[in-house]
Amino acid sequence: MPFQREHSYAVYILGSISGTLYIGVTNNLKFRVSQHKDHSFGGFTAKYEVDRLLYFEIFREVTDAIKREKQLKGWRREKKIALIEKDNPQWKDLSREWFQPPLVQKFDWQL
């Protein structure tokens, strides 16, 4: 049987400091969030500085992820906020640690 790579898909909600929300879908959440953070492509998220990962869900099937993305995009803002705040009440950037440089351990002789 040939090797078959497993895929996963993420539906995510990004937010800005001012509270602007953006919903998207991707097959590589870490890479996609990094694109939003460094504004490597123009558009809505770059214009409104929407680069904080507030919420995400993982799906095995792309069709399920797209269906969920469309569902969330159809929700009123209040319902989206309730979804975020259920798991992330302080609106912390869930990707913050993904992009920080690794901690460097200092040895006694380096101090």
PLM region spans:
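Residues at or immediately preceding the N-termini of alpha-helices
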Residues: 29-30, 61-63, 77
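Mid-chain, well-packed structural core segment of small domains
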Residues: 58-73
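Short arginine-rich
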Residues: 70-83
